[in-house]
Amino acid sequence: MRPNDRAADQVRPIKITRNYTAYAEGSVLVEFGNTKVLCNATVEESVPRWLKGQGKGWVTAEYGMLPRATHSRTRREAANGKQGGRTMEIQRLIARSLRAVVDLEAMGEFMITVDCDVIQADGGTRTASISGASVAMADAFQHLVDSGKLKANPMKGHVAAVSVGILGEDVLCDLEYVEDSAADTDMNVVMTEEGKMIEIQGTAEGEPFSHEQLLALLESAKKGISEIVAAQKAALAN
């Protein structure tokens, strides 16, 4: 039995709070159960040097965890003088996922940076970051439209992500930490709102998984992501 008696293919309760902070052009607190991530999207009227003069924009991301986001305190990466490999991998994943749903040429020479800060971690922090960042980015683009700097929102749709895994004989969706740490297979899936794949990260931690199990994992992820996209759209409609 899963925590909180969730069904195997059921995502955790999702809460998306927009305009969470006062200064960012897009600010979202996203909650998946006990996992909470603050996603702030900042607009800059400039692009990286290698893009200057091309009439294209750029979307990038940064990711971090507060020291007590987990059960025991983790030393700040700034205190260590460098980012860890996991952090760099995750923020690149977030950025790639966001760019996949943006028409960079239509956004002009603007850059959006989405900072994803994990306030509390209970599994699925990277997937929650992507799902929250999509909403924050949508608000940042709408800010550019409302201010007359863009004619239309250059987002082609929403992007969302979820973790899936195999625990025993069960395919589970949106794993909490206690499930993730015990899973035989752990997979992160990123999709567009149309169900097109952006990224699949899957590893057999214990027993190898079959082709049939892979398809079951992807089907579970697709269902979960459709629920997340519905929550994103509902949040933006308010």
Swiss-Prot record:
Keywords: Nucleotidyltransferase, RNA-binding, rRNA processing, Transferase, tRNA processing, tRNA-binding. GO terms for biological process: rRNA catabolic process; rRNA processing; tRNA processing. GO terms for molecular function: 3'-5'-RNA exonuclease activity; tRNA binding; tRNA nucleotidyltransferase activity. Pfam families: RNase_PH, RNase_PH_C. PROSITE patterns: RIBONUCLEASE_PH. InterPro entries: ExoRNase_PH_dom1, ExoRNase_PH_dom2, ExoRNase_PH_dom2_sf, PNPase/RNase_PH_dom_sf, Ribosomal_Su5_D2-typ_SF, RNase_PH, RNase_PH_bac-type, RNase_PH_CS. CDD domains: RNase_PH_bact. Its EC number is 2.7.7.56. The keyword rRNA processing applies. Phosphate binds at R86, G124, T125, R126. HAMAP family: RNase_PH. Belongs to the RNase PH family. This is Ribonuclease PH.
